[in-house]
Regions:
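Aromatic- and Gly/Pro-enriched helix-to-coil junctions and flexible linker segments
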Residues: 17-205
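Bacterial N-terminal signal peptides
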Residues: 5-17
Length: 205
């Protein structure tokens, strides 16, 4: 029997905070941008940004990112009165020309998160809200995948300082260290391609 050896690796970025009952800028909005690659070094996270729009690399400076999104460019990136008209949504949804292509389909959960945050008035998290203290990777199967169905589904749970736990699978960025051996989809589905060892990294802000 041909077996595909998999090892779950993950990276966690802490200091996230959460606002109960509202979309969290730090724990939801910024992870959406990271998940889509918007603040990567090859995109708006580069030192010079892209197209006059610069974000901190992998959201390391939440306050600066909030200012860039809501204040810079004459506040044109955000339209609180009609969120659908915000450049932050129109560009990645391909409603307007976007060099990065389609990133946020209008029917996606990520689009709705950004829309609701804008609709709420673009709040930034209160320093008093609970911090993210860790994440846990859960899987519906073993870390050794066997043919003829070499697949597994990952679920990512975040823990907060107040004891709360939340499923953040839809907010994390997955990547495989060797896609010739295994691939990982945005929903956490890992699929073996051929025999070997590959690491899966999970990034959550």
């Amino acid at each position: 029997m041909l077996a595909l050896l998999m090892r779950w690796f993950f990276t966690i970025f802490l200091t996230g905070i959460i606002v109960e009952g509202a979309v969290s800028f730090r724990n939801e909005v910024l992870p959406v941008l990271t998940r889509q690659g918007c603040n990567a070094g090859t995109c708006h996270g580069s030192p010079s940004g892209k197209g006059g729009f610069a974000l901190s690399l992998f959201a390391f400076d939440a306050a600066a990112d909030h200012r860039v999104l809501t204040k810079d460019f004459l506040s044109r990136r955000i339209d609180v009165l009609d969120p659908h008209l915000s450049l932050l949504l129109r560009k990645p949804s391909n409603d307007l020309s976007h060099r990065g292509g389609l990133k946020l389909p209008k029917d996606s959960r990520e689009y709705r998160i950004l829309h609701d945050w804008i609709s709420d008035g673009c709040p930034i998290d209160s320093p008093a809200t609970p911090a993210c203290v860790g994440i846990e990777i859960q899987t519906n199967g073993p870390s050794v995948l066997h043919w003829p169905q070499p697949t597994a589904k990952l679920r990512i749970m975040a823990s907060f300082a107040d004891g709360a736990k939340r499923d953040v699978t839809h907010l994390v960025q997955f990547s495989s260290s060797d896609e010739a051996i295994a691939t990982v989809q945005p929903n956490g589905t890992v699929k073996g391609v051929r025999r070997g060892l590959s690491a899966v990294m999970v990034r959550y802000l």
